[in-house]
Amino acid sequence: MQFRINIIDDEKNLNDLVRTYLEKEGYIVYSFYTYDEALMHKDDDVHLWLIDIMLDRASGFELFNEIKASRPKMPIIFMSARDQEFDRIIGLEKGSDDYITKPFNIKEVILRINNLIKRSYDDPSKIKMDGYDIDLEKRRVFNGGEEVILTT
């Protein structure tokens, strides 16, 4: 399963750089450069948002609130040039999962995203549905711990 990430940063070069590295890691990435553009996608079926705080028309904090209102469990990482302790504390108090200050090491960003994805989502090869446990990788189904024999 490929995980999908939305990025909002009005610095096009930085946005494109992060997107390129995430795509090399196997993520499907959608980039937005304006608050309004990102707001239209707040309900997208993605696994994580990477949000710059200083945007064109409104703040990343406002976008965060919009996303969390409809998707309260959505993992969100703030990234910002606002590197004062006060700014980081506000971001984390709002409920973000992480706060990365610019400039940053892209490898560190990738590792933070990888770790958050692992913590936030169960093994994608295993599904629970209507009391059944389905192991897609091994192609086996279990009901109450007992394997269900499937035939064609």
Task: Go through each PLM region and give its residues.
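Conserved phosphate-coupling serine/threonine residues in phosphotransfer and NTP-handling enzymes
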Residues: 52, 80, 151
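Basic, amphipathic DNA-recognition helix from helix-turn-helix-like DNA-binding domains
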Residues: 11, 59, 65, 69-128
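Conserved sequence signature across two-component system core domains
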Residues: 8-9, 32, 49, 100
